[in-house]
Amino acid sequence: MTRIGLLSDTHSYWDDAYLRHFKDCDEIWHAGDIGSISIIEQLASTGKKIRAVYGNIDGQDVRGQFPLHNRFTVEEVTVWMTHIGGYPAKYNPNIIAELTKKPPMLFVCVHSHIAKVMYDKSLQMLHINPGAAGK
């Protein structure tokens, strides 16, 4: 089983607690609003696989390294991670067509800074908003 450390909205804020929380993880996923590429560098220093997307506050240093949307598969689970995705019945209009055409099993998105986990019955996918890790 792959263990995932999930965070978002660090806004350039580093907390050593990230390393404690993620020490037993196999991968670390950052769902955008990283703020500074130094956050990624510190996460990468753990030697764990890093997956990320850029958010609306991220500059070119982050946007040059990570996509707006990241679709991938982990242990046969299809994942779509993006920063501004919306919520069940209120998805971002920019992604709704693709989301309904080819929904992932797991949809990770943020922007509200409030951690939530919901199951979208209509698309049969788990929706996770990790909330804000920064200040």
What do these predicted ranges mean?
Residues M1-I50, D58-H69, E76:
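N-terminal active-site segment of His-dependent metallophosphoesterases
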Residues R51-A97, K101-K102:
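Helix-adjacent hinge/juxtasegments
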Residues H21-D24, T73, T100-K102, S122:
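Flexible, charged surface loops at secondary-structure boundaries
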Residues L6-S8, E27-D33, R51-N56, M81-H83, ...:
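Active-site neighborhood of phospho(di)ester-bond hydrolases with catalytic His/Asp-centered motifs
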Residues Y13-W14, E41, Q60, M81, ...:
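A broad, structure-centric signal for solvent-exposed, well-ordered loop/edge residues
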Residues S12, S36, G86, I114, ...:
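Short active-site segment of divalent metal-dependent hydrolases/proteases
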